[in-house]
Amino acid sequence: MLRIITQQADVKAELQRICDRTHDEQVLHKEATVREVLQAVKRQGDKAVLHYTDEFDNQILKAEELRVTGSELDAAYQQVSQELLEAIQLASRQIEAFHRQRVPKSWVHFGDDDIVLGKRYTPIDRAGLYVPGGRAAYVSTVLMNAIPARVAGVPRIVIATPPGAQKAINPAVLVAAQEVGVQEIYRVGGAQAIAALAYGTETIPKVDVITGPGNIYVTLAKKLVYGNVGIDSLAGPSEVLIIADEGANPVHVATDMLAQAEHDPMAAAILFTTDPALAKNVQVAVERQLVDHPRRIDTEKAIAHYGLIVLVESLDAAAELSNEFAPEHLELEVKDPWAVLPNIRHAGAIFLGYSTPEAVGDYLAGPNHTLPTSGAARYASALSVETFLKHSSIIQYSQTALNKVAGAIDALATAEGLPSHADSVKRRIQQDE
């Protein structure tokens, strides 16, 4: 059952327990398996990818079957409803419109003495997007990862996603990929997919950045290949924190909590409220909705282990506790969310008001739903166009400008014991003279 505790209880310790749920010994023990997979793929390429696809996904593939064919891509459109296709297209338009507003611009500044300083943004060459399989067809994951990469101008975007029964990829995933311009899709999942994207194989290209969520094996693999390639983040199980007052609808709050819990048995769903009646009503509503929930077993586990209702003294107190937890998703289900918002410092995405459930942001509002988890919102942000861009500094000095700073550079280089640094300036000054 969903627990109710008061702020006077050891709330911070309980929140820390939930935040640390991916750091237990059982999870860390899996790192050895992931290291083995990474090394095998690095050494053996396609052979290892095929071996682990058989072992972990129970699908026997040949190397030539790794890439989804053009005929499979075409056939996918016949297997999705017109309603779903139109929803994908609507979401694509809105996500693209938002991300196009966030493209950073290169710039240069022309200063005194013909000094030119600036910053130049360029896209990476190749992006690898991981799309989970298994529990659902993660159409939104395709959109939220591929669209920012495309807007950034990445010339080659590839998707890796695990094969299902009979080697099939969910047609909705294939349609979503094509709608956002991705035709290169590989049927490979898990740590072996991350290894293939990081190191390259005979069939799967090595990429520059890997993005997209996955299970603990995928997350550990991304952690271990970081440095060889860039990654978006180390995504843990999903989480929502709801701050609600007496005006919130308990059935709506309960549904929002279950919407998070249904993701994964380790997902977290937390409510902070000033109203004891709301707390009790939400507790009852959660139990009622669980009775015939299609994902009852996993959802019930998440609620039992990582679900929590905390009675707080004030909305200010709720905001401060929220900042310590730094949730992936934060819902402000209060009468005046704009009054609470200034007190929020750490959250991946913030949903304002009674009519803005997290699902709006998950699917089509526009902002990215790939967000920092497990407290990482204290220092990290959502996936964005900049995930797929690099920036280079632009510097040009005239001889006049160099002459003016030569003494300072000489002093700094000498202090650091780097004589050739100093000489690289002094010889240009001598040459000018």
Curated annotation (Swiss-Prot):
SUPFAM superfamilies: ALDH-like. Its EC number is 1.1.1.23. One of its GO terms (molecular function) is zinc ion binding. It comes from the Bacteria. It is an enzyme of class 1 (oxidoreductase). Keywords: Amino-acid biosynthesis, Histidine biosynthesis, Metal-binding, NAD, Oxidoreductase, Zinc. GO terms for cellular component: cytosol. Zn(2+) binds at residues 260, 263, 362, 421. The active site is at 328 (proton acceptor), 329 (proton acceptor). The keyword Isomerase does not apply. Pathway: Amino-acid biosynthesis; L-histidine biosynthesis; L-histidine from 5-phospho-alpha-D-ribose 1-diphosphate: step 9/9. Its cofactor is Zn(2+). Substrate binds at residues 238, 260, 263, 329, 362, 416, 421. NAD(+) binds at residues 130, 192, 215. InterPro entries: Ald_DH/histidinol_DH (IPR016161), Histidinol_DH_CS (IPR001692), Histidinol_DH_monofunct (IPR022695), Hstdl_DH (IPR012131). Binds 1 zinc ion per subunit. It catalyses: L-histidinol + 2 NAD(+) + H2O = L-histidine + 2 NADH + 3 H(+). GO terms for biological process: L-histidine biosynthetic process. The keyword Nucleotide-binding does not apply. Catalyzes the sequential NAD-dependent oxidations of L-histidinol to L-histidinaldehyde and then to L-histidine. Belongs to the histidinol dehydrogenase family. This is Histidinol dehydrogenase 2. It comes from Nostoc sp. (strain PCC 7120 / SAG 25.82 / UTEX 2576). The gene is hisD2.
